[in-house]
Structures are given as C-alpha cells and as structure tokens.
C-alpha cells in the first residue's frame, strides 16, 4: 500500500465515523473492513471505573465488535453520541505510517464551533492483502 493509499485509507476510516447517511456509512464500512473484520476498543478509564462500580469485571477488559452489523452499530453509536448534534467532528492527524500490513495514526475530535481539540486517540489497523481492515485497535485518550 503506497503512501497515498495509506492516506486515503486513513481519511476514509476517520470519515466513516462522521458519516451522516446511514446507507453510505454501511457501504463504506463494507468497503473498508473485511467481512469478519474486528474493532477493539481500549475503554477510557472513566468507563472502566463506572463498570467496575456496577459490579462488572471490566477493569482491564477490551470491547470488541466483529462483522459488518456490529461494526455498523459501533460506528453509528459513536456518530450519534459525538457528531450528529453538530458539536464535534473527527479528523485525522497527519502522522499515518505503514509497516507491512499495519497502519498507525492518530485522530482528533474537535469542536466544530472553535476548532479546539477536545479529544482524540491512537488507531492501529491491520489490513489484508486487498487493503481491507481485519483488525482495528482504538486507543482513545
């Protein structure tokens, strides 16, 4: 995968999290991920604390979505929570690197009114020979 293809993958990946049209979002998910692709989320500390306080053993758990339906639900929920109201948008940082079948980059969540960075994270994608995501590791900060 060339540098331009890596940048395109990153742009499309970050873009799908802000896609308003549900049909287009699903189509893009099916284009980006392999059919049995996985998304792993390292939950923020606040999430772990709340879950632990409710008696769940999530202190060190990783959340996982597998396959198009679960991936679509995960992306849609993030869209609804952060983007749909118009308050925030996601954007990639210009630091994507590829090493064999792994792409690493950072992303930011910015306030649409001010451009202020409100959050972000590190993303590590493993892709197959066709450039489709087989494993997606998200580390929000």
Where are the regions a protein language model picked out?
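C-terminal and inter-domain tail/linker signature
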Residues: 1-141
């Amino acid at each position: 995968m060339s540098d331009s293809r890596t940048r395109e993958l990153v742009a499309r990946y970050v873009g799908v999290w802000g896609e308003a049209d549900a049909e287009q979002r699903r189509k893009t998910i099916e284009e980006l991920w392999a059919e049995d692709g996985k998304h792993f989320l390292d939950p923020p500390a606040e999430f772990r604390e709340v879950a632990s306080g409710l008696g769940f053993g999530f202190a060190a758990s990783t959340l996982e979505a597998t396959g198009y339906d679960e991936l679509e639900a995960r992306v849609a929920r993030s869209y609804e929570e952060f983007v749909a109201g118009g308050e925030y948008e996601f954007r990639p940082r210009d630091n994507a690197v590829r090493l064999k079948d792994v792409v690493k980059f950072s992303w930011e969540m910015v306030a649409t009114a001010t451009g202020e960075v409100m959050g972000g994270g590190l993303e590590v994608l493993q892709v197959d020979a066709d450039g489709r995501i087989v494993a997606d590791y998200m580390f929000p900060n």
